[in-house]
Amino acid sequence: MNTPETFDFKFYEWEEKFRDKPFLKQPFGDEWEIYTWGEVGQYARKLATGLRSLGLRENAHIGLISKNCREWIIADLAIVMAGYISVPFFPNLTSGEINTLLTFGDVDLLFAGKVEDWEEQKAGVPEGMPIISFPTYKGCSDITEGHQWFDFINQHEPLQEPHKPKLSDVWTIIFTSGTTGNPKGVVLDYLANQSTAELTLDTNALKIDFNGNNTFFSYLPLNHIAERVVVEYAVFRFGGTLSFAENLDTFAKNLQETQPTVFFAVPRIWTKFQMGILSKIPQEKLSKLLKIPVLSWILKRKFNKALGLSKARSIVS
């Protein structure tokens, strides 16, 4: 049995406890497709078996290029189960940037998914590198190279004995954006995650429900360490559901339907929210209304409900 120190151990606990409860929620137009904790566990185990069948080296580096989606989470979990190291990238890289990072990251296999210009990007993938492609999403590229997601998963049985990482093992390599020069890979071990978990448990600054009653919404790039820890790692570690935005046009609708209990945002998102509010109420009038305590309280509640934040216990920026 693994020690209760790495996030995969907690995933197995939630999987057992919440086997038939919703975990990953993916929007498709007006509909949401839901994977339960049990289904995600089975998909990840089958994928892990498939990865091991490819004869990769020990501690192989597995690249991942895709916008946020359920397959991203399953692939990341399978990489851990198989005993490999994830190397995620921004989904909008050019072919030259992809080639550079695949080389710097010493990547052995690439998951390619929800991207918009694969025809240009694939030129940066070294010849002969194995590829596993996600299902095609509306508005994104149809990737026909390599192993197809469901075909590959369904060829394999669930991995019976997933890898049991130690705190000192490398978990992931996160590349910087490279805006100030060549991108640099930051190597993180499982201890980094455990330290975050301990801090959350001690302070509960995120107002997490430790019984698994949490709702997360993922839209910022998962290859960025902040989204990876505050959203992906948090749901693995503390339980709940994780929903995604379908695209930029549906962001507001998807957020409103999700009503997350923990919401992580960057300044440009707040600017977008502000512009939406000011398009309905002029700044001068809004400022006057917010100075009246009762009206201020009512307006803030209405704004939060309209934005999809009425159930948010914690808003992080």
Question: Where in this protein do the model-derived segments appear?
Answer:
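Conserved AMP-binding/adenylate-forming core of the ANL superfamily
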Residues: 23-69, 73, 77, 94-99, ...
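A short N-terminal helical cap/helix-turn-helix that marks the beginning
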Residues: 2-23, 42
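Conserved AMP-binding A3 loop
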Residues: 34-38, 171-197
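Conserved pre-ATP/AMP-binding loop-to-beta segment of ANL
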Residues: 22, 154-175, 182, 208-215
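Conserved AMP-binding/adenylation subdomain of ANL enzymes
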Residues: 194-218, 222-311
